Curated annotation (Swiss-Prot):
The lineage of its organism: Bacteria, Pseudomonadati, Pseudomonadota, Alphaproteobacteria, Rhodobacterales. Homodimer. UreD, UreF and UreG form a complex that acts as a GTP-hydrolysis-dependent molecular chaperone, activating the urease apoprotein by helping to assemble the nickel containing metallocenter of UreC. The UreE protein probably delivers the nickel. The keyword tRNA processing does not apply. It is found in: Cytoplasm. InterPro entries: CobW/HypB/UreG_nucleotide-bd, P-loop_NTPase, UreG. It comes from Cereibacter sphaeroides (strain KD131 / KCTC 12085) (Rhodobacter sphaeroides). Its main location: cytoplasm. This is Urease accessory protein UreG.
Amino acid sequence: MSHGPLRVGIGGPVGAGKTTLTEKLCAALAHRCSMAVITNDIYTREDAEALMRAQVLPAERIRGVETGGCPHTAIREDASINLAAVADLRRTFPDLDLILIESGGDNLAATFSPELADLTIYVIDTAAGQDIPRKRGPGLARSDLLVVNKIDLAPHVGVNLARLEADTQAARGQRPYVMARMRAGVGVEAIVAFLEREGGLLLLPQD
């Protein structure tokens, strides 16, 4: 019996690189499994439109949800708008293996309802400062995978990368993390391996 597609929540502050991560995962996986994306924006469908422009997935496999108000409510306390989008995608594409659910930009406290996401990936931005891992919000400390993005910017913003990674390790304990440069595709392979290992995602072999 099928349990339906693996649902992966992608969260993190505005500008951390969530949409870039979503785009890179689509580019890496769209030819290896049946997948779709749901994006959450407060008043627009900007992220969904950005993915459509990038042409990483057919437009009909991308749903843009306008959350209004606080974006974290739509992924946690009242996930009904996202659950409806999941149900719609499953009706349209019964063979789905993977749905990526990108939250609207939010703070370190954002978490996904377990009803909505099987796994959660949280993205932080190296340029946001040295102390981000030490703030240890639930998204950063308890997500299934943490992505520390834009590590190439560290020398330009006065961040000591070795210390940032040590603080990240301390905040995460045994939970995995990836040091990444999403725009250049650095870290994408490790994230794909995580989805296979922890989510049981079955992929066709690479061409």
